Amino acid sequence: MTKIVRSKYKASRRLGVSLWGDSKDAFNIRNYRPGQHGQNTMIKTSDYGLHLKAKQRLKCHYGRVTEKQFRNIFELAQKMKGNTGENFIGLLESRLDTVVYRMNIAPTIFAARQLVSHGHIKLNGKKADIASIRLKEGDVVEVKESIKQIALIQESILKQGQTTPNYLSFDVPSLTGKYLRVPNLSDVPYPFEAEVHLVIELYSR
């Protein structure tokens, strides 16, 4: 996990934003790219480069989502009725690992994925160990009783002063939450400007 944490901070500096809003993020101290020419602000980025960076920022924010998975989610969003960008975000935010992270059950998206894959999360009363499971309105997420006291969970509970997004509800004493509805882009608490329109334009080429 330490290796993952270090690499995620490098990603923040490389992409020029704090990807998860973490106070420990090295980007908050050195808000320029790593490397010899990191502080050179005269380097121009091409139109394609801007679109690519927007995609990389959004994909990295969701942790270990592969490029193939990310593109498949976009293609599904494109086939749905309504706005493709809003559909895209709705699908990303309905993933089980994302919901666990947004509920502050885990301190990072990486830890959320680990909790799910290790079988520590229940969905509607049953063990759920696939991070990419898509939740539906009314689905209930719960931490298994046997691990409610582990340090990772307790650390995250201390952060419950953070606001749970309005498309979720969460009860701290029982460590149980509910997926209330599909969110809009404006509902999602990204710590950076999520330029979803650029991602859509990139994948639509």
UniProtKB/Swiss-Prot annotation:
Q: How does it assemble?
A: Part of the 30S ribosomal subunit. Contacts protein S5. The interaction surface between S4 and S5 is involved in control of translational fidelity.
Q: Name one Pfam family in it.
A: Ribosomal_S4
GO molecular function ontology, one term from the record: rRNA binding
Q: Which UniProt keywords apply?
A: Ribonucleoprotein, Ribosomal protein, RNA-binding, rRNA-binding
Q: Which GO terms describe its cellular component?
A: small ribosomal subunit
Record protein name field: Small ribosomal subunit protein uS4
Q: Which gene encodes it?
A: rpsD
| A GO biological-process term | translation
Q: Which HAMAP family match?
A: Ribosomal_uS4_B
Q: Which residues form the S4 RNA-binding domain?
A: 94-157
Task: Cite the InterPro entries for this sequence.
Answer: Ribosomal_uS4, Ribosomal_uS4_bac-type, Ribosomal_uS4_CS, Ribosomal_uS4_N, S4_RNA-bd, S4_RNA-bd_sf
User: Keyword Ribonucleoprotein: yes or no?
Assistant: yes
Described purpose of this protein according to its UniProt entry: One of the primary rRNA binding proteins, it binds directly to 16S rRNA where it nucleates assembly of the body of the 30S subunit. With S5 and S12 plays an important role in translational accuracy.
Its family remark reads: Belongs to the universal ribosomal protein uS4 family.
PANTHER family listed in its UniProt record: 30S 40S RIBOSOMAL PROTEIN, SMALL RIBOSOMAL SUBUNIT PROTEIN US4M
* UniProt cross-references to SUPFAM superfamilies, sorted A to Z: Alpha-L RNA-binding motif
NCBIfam families in the cross-refs: PRK05327.1 (NF003717), rpsD_bact (TIGR01017)
